[in-house]
């Protein structure tokens, strides 16, 4: 077992998270006192996020309940060291006229808008728009002209809201916009977003079953694989993650590959029981290893991965871990966002 290490940039929230233990029902809210730090801390945090490291990535929707007293429903309550947030409940706006037609998936959420831009400005967190990438049920025709118009529509949604990029959820399920057409779609967007655009804006593709073509790779910053445990699953092994990466390893560098869990289903324990390649089932703190932290610890045999993360990770704000004695946990107090906080530490351990 690796030596216990505390990543000092994990955030004041993770270091000072002595909280009252909560019930295991997600609807029970905890009020978390907002913690602050000095400017040097935030400068170090921003510098860390600009460095070459495996990132923490997540789809987040909790901000849509901006009136909630729970920190789990606010951008400012997120772990400081999350690198990229994909907006799963629309783009927050502070301009009600901007969202009248909702053409760009914008929502009038002024509190969320301010908090989102605070974590971008102060904590260096990048925030990207997210869309399920299908042309059906849109206003755009299934033609080359329609393809380009749809691509430019998504680019504009990023630029007019000054976001940090775009996450395309590639799950065509028979949609016209797939295969070679999706590659062309990526090439168009790639003129304005992604590594070939020189814009500083991210272009991300996330996917589950259908795999994007290798020709998309030069245009994309990260490929995020939904390595989701089924809702009724109880365990996962590192070998499963390796197979997920091997499917694209001939053309996708490991540093572009992000592995993610379905935390909306598996929030109580931080995933399902996880077994590493060497048979280990314990984390660096002596607690039973579950798949979110297991994904953070894992790397493909080809090299360091791009990162780890989760879908609907806000569900884990109310957790009993790592103090759930029924699972074999060894600690005394629960930690909000336990799996993400500890996963970041496992993935990027501090140096002695």
Show which residues each predicted segment covers.
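Chitinase-like catalytic core of GlcNAc-active glycosidases
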Residues: 52-284, 305, 309, 314, ...
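Secreted, disulfide-rich extracellular signaling modules
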Residues: 12-13, 236, 299-302
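Generic detector of well-ordered alpha-helical segments enriched in charged/polar residues
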Residues: 42-46, 242, 337-345
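Bacterial Sec-dependent N-terminal signal peptides
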Residues: 1-7, 13-52
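Short, low-complexity, Pro/Ser/Thr/Gly-rich segments in the mature regions of secreted, periplasmic
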Residues: 330-352
């Amino acid at each position: 077992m690796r030596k216990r290490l505390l990543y000092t940039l994990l955030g004041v929230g993770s270091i000072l998270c002595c909280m009252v233990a909560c019930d295991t029902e997600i609807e029970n809210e905890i009020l978390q006192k907002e913690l602050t730090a000095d400017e040097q801390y935030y400068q170090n945090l921003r510098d860390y996020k600009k460095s070459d490291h495996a990132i923490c990535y997540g789809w987040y929707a909790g901000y849509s309940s901006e009136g909630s007293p729970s920190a789990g429903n606010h951008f400012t309550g997120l772990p400081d060291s999350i690198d990229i947030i994909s907006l799963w409940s629309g783009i927050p706006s502070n301009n009600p006229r901007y969202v009248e037609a909702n053409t760009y998936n914008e929502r009038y959420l002024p509190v969320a808008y301010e908090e989102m831009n605070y974590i971008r400005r102060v904590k260096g967190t990048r925030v990207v728009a997210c869309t399920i990438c299908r042309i059906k049920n849109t206003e755009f025709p299934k033609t080359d002209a329609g393809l380009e118009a749809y691509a430019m529509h998504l680019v504009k949604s990023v630029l007019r809201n000054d976001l940090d990029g775009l996450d395309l959820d590639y799950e065509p399920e028979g949609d016209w916009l797939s295969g070679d057409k999706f590659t062309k779609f990526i090439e168009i967007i790639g003129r304005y977003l992604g590594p070939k655009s020189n814009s500083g804006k991210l272009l991300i593709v996330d996917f589950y079953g259908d795999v994007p073509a290798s020709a998309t790779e030069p245009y994309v910053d990260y490929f995020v694989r939904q390595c989701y445990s089924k809702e009724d699953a109880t365990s996962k092994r590192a070998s499963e993650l390796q197979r997920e990466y091997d499917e694209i390893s001939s053309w996708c560098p490991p540093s572009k590959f992000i592995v993610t869990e379905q935390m909306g289903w598996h929030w109580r324990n931080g995933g399902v029981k996880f077994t590493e390649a060497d048979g280990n089932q314990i984390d660096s703190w002596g607690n039973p290893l579950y798949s979110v932290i297991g994904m953070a610890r894992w790397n493909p045999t080809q090299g360091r991965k791009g990162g780890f993360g989760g879908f609907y990770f806000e569900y884990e704000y109310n957790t009993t871990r790592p103090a759930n004695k029924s699972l074999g946990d060894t600690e005394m107090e629960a930690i909000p966002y336990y799996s993400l906080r500890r996963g970041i530490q496992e993935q990027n351990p501090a140096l002695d």
